[in-house]
Structure formats: structure tokens, C-alpha cells
Amino acid sequence: SGDENDGGLGFDFKWNMGWMNDFLDFMSADPLFRKGRYGELTFSMIYAYSEDFILVISHDEVVHGKASMINKMPETDLDEKFSDLRAAYGFMYTHPGKKLLFMGQDFGQFNEWWEEKSLDWDELSNEHNRMLHRYMKDLNALYKKEPALYELDYNPDGFEWINNISADECIVSYVRRAKNGDELLVVVSFTPVLREKYKIGVPSAGQYKEIFNSNAKKYGGTGKLNSRVRVSEESECDNRRNSIHITVPPLGICIFRKVEQDEDIEKAEESKKNVTAKKSKK
């Protein structure tokens, strides 16, 4: 994708085969042993801006004995298997680079793709497949809605690691940024461990509201979310001056947006004032 005047070929995009190979190798590993392959998850950002990349999971990866995406997930428990795939797709969609996902993988088709037959649409009658399909629909809508997820794909200003060294926990966290400076805080966990009161550094002091969580019940998760706005405190973490405590879903992704003043907090404060005023009158 380099400019022809600079010796490049001048294509609009290039498939990121390095990311694809590392990512699929990482995802195929047992979650309990992924910490030994943590570098495969983070290495792609070292060369992410050397080309205009597309993150690609093509038909080549779901044929000829390579297994469909859902069957690349190593878990035997079906709930965990689909949770893992939701985390994988969430990471893919929040990682810099355009996206290519082959048909059928968006609803978790169990069989490999075969060019002589149609997709197994009947699998959408299964609850797990149907909820993954809904998840992908919402993930695509989020991607389309949030410029931070695509505007600066090929500019280093659009991405910033918060933590890319938590190998033991197998958690990565980072910021995606839009041209106007709007930021999204992304946290992804690749182990089946629910982590409550998990401390994470934030780009700046303020209030952080969760806008997306793969652990929602409508997607097949347990419903353990970050329903309340997290207010940062001046406590150093991840080489950041300010931090928040969150619930990190097992095999999942959660995304936060910094908000100026949450409506729920405003209502709660107004309610407290009213109660105090009534007590004073009495």
C-alpha cells in the first residue's frame, strides 16, 4: 500500500497475514496457557503502521481441515466457546486496521465452509448462534457509530496502549482515538476468570461509562457488567496518574467512554438534595 513514488505498489490496502496467523495461533491455545503466547497478541502493533492493513479472516482460514472460527476456540464448554469468540471478534474490531470476516463466521457456523453448499442458516435456530449473530450486529453498529474505531487506523495518534504486559492475567487494555480527540477505553480478557474491582489506568481524570460489554445476557454472557459510571481517583496505575476499578468479564471485552456528567449521577445528586431539603423543612 506504499506510494508508487516511494517504491510501493500503490494498492489501497494490504491483508495483514502476520496479525491473522499470530491471532489465530493465540486463540487456539488453551486459555490457561495463553500467558506463554501473550506476545502473539500484542506484537502486531509494532508494525501496524508500516502498511495500510486489513485485518482479515478469510475463507482460506475456515476450509480444508482448518476448522470454522467457533471450532478454533479450544474450550469444550459451549458457553465458554462462544464467549471466547465474542472476545476475539471484539479485539479484532477495536484493533487498528479495516476488517474482513468471511461469511458464516458471524453467527458461529460449526461446519467449515464448503463452496458446493449454502451456509448452515438453520443453525440460527440455536440459541448460541442466534445470540452471537446479535452480538456481531451490535458490534458492527458500534463500529459504524464510533469514529474512534476507524478514523485514525493508519495514524499512531489513533491508538495507545494502557497495558500490554499483563501476560499472567492475559488482559490487554488500550485507547482508540478519533480525529476530534474523542477516546474509547478498551479492556479485553482472554481467560475464563471474572475479575472484580480490577484496577486500570485511564488517559485522564473523569467519569467513565461502559458502552459495550460482550458479557451481556443478550449475547449469551452472565450479565455481570459495569452498570454504574466509574469515577476516576488519583491513584497511579499502568504508569497513569488516574485510575478506575472495573469488572472485567471472563473471556470478554468491555468498552468505556469518558463522559462529562452522567445523567444517572445528576438524578441521584438531585434526589439527595430534595431529600435533604425535605428533612430540613421538618
Question: Which residues make up each language-model segment?
Answer:
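Substrate-binding cleft/loops of secretory-pathway carbohydrate-active enzymes
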Residues: 1-33, 42-48, 110-113
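Aromatic-lined glycan-binding groove of carbohydrate-active enzymes
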Residues: 28-70
